[in-house]
Amino acid sequence: MIARLVGFLVEKNSDSAVIDVNGVGYLVQLSGRALDYFSEIEGEITVHIETQIREDSITLFGFASYLERDWFRLLTSVQGVGGKAALAILTALTCDAISVAISSGDKTMICRANGIGPKIAQRIINELKEKPAAIALFSSAKGDHLAVEDISQPAASAHHAGNFMADAVSALLNLGFKPAEAQRVVQLASEELGDQATLDSLVRLALRLSSKH
C-alpha cells in the first residue's frame, strides 16, 4: 500500500497529476485545491496518499495535508460517495467549511460540489454528524453556523485566522520544515496579509518568505 509520495510534479490535468519519484511516474487523483497548492511549489513535494484497490484497478488519491486525507476517508465511508465525489467536495469546500456544513446540517453548502445532489448531501450529514471520527475533526468549527459566503471569504475573525495559521503550519511541517521555522514564517505571512489571510495565501507567502531567509 502506498501511503506517501515524495517527488516532483511533472504533469497535471484538471483533476490529476503525475508525480515523478526517482524516475517512476505515479498518476494521482487530486482535489482542485490540492492541485493548485502543489502547482505553486517549486521543487520536491510530499503527497499524502490513499490507495483504493478494486477488482480491475488501483487508484491513488493524493492530498496536501493529513486533514484533507482524513476528510476524504470519512466522506468515502458514506454509502454512495466514491472517491471522485469526495474529491469534488474537497474541491468545492475547505475542510473547515465541510465541518461547518455537517455540524450545522447545511446540505445546500455540500451541494456546491459538482455531482452532489440534495439526497447525497443529506446522507453525508446524517451519517457523519454523530460519527466519533467526524466529531474529532469538527474541532472548534462545530456549532459555528456561518453562512456559505462567509466560508469562502478571507478570514474575518481571530478564530478563523487561528485555524488558517494552524493549518498552514501543518502544511509546512508536511513539506519538511522544522516546527520553529514553520511557525516563524507563517506568523510573518499572517502579519503581512492581515484580514485578507486565507489558508492558500498564508502557505504561498510563507514559502516565499522562507526562501528569502
Swiss-Prot record:
Query: Its Gene Ontology biological processes?
Result: DNA recombination; DNA repair
Q: Where is this region: Domain III?
A: 160-213
Read off the HAMAP family from this record. DNA_HJ_migration_RuvA
Stretches the record annotates as Domain II: 65-143
State the family it belongs to: Belongs to the RuvA family.
Q: Where is this region: Domain I?
A: 1-64
Q: Name one GO molecular function term.
A: four-way junction helicase activity
User: Per the entry's comment, what about the domains?
Assistant: Has three domains with a flexible linker between the domains II and III and assumes an 'L' shape. Domain III is highly mobile and contacts RuvB.
Q: Name where it's found.
A: Cytoplasm
What this protein is reported to do is described as: The RuvA-RuvB-RuvC complex processes Holliday junction (HJ) DNA during genetic recombination and DNA repair, while the RuvA-RuvB complex plays an important role in the rescue of blocked DNA replication forks via replication fork reversal (RFR). RuvA specifically binds to HJ cruciform DNA, conferring on it an open structure. The RuvB hexamer acts as an ATP-dependent pump, pulling dsDNA into and through the RuvAB complex. HJ branch migration allows RuvC to scan DNA until it finds its consensus sequence, where it cleaves and resolves the cruciform DNA.
> Which parts of the sequence are annotated with region: Flexible linker?
144-159
The entry's protein name is Holliday junction branch migration complex subunit RuvA
Q: Which UniProt keywords apply?
A: Cytoplasm, DNA damage, DNA recombination, DNA repair, DNA-binding
UniProt entry tagged with the keyword Ribonucleoprotein: no
Primary location class = cytoplasm
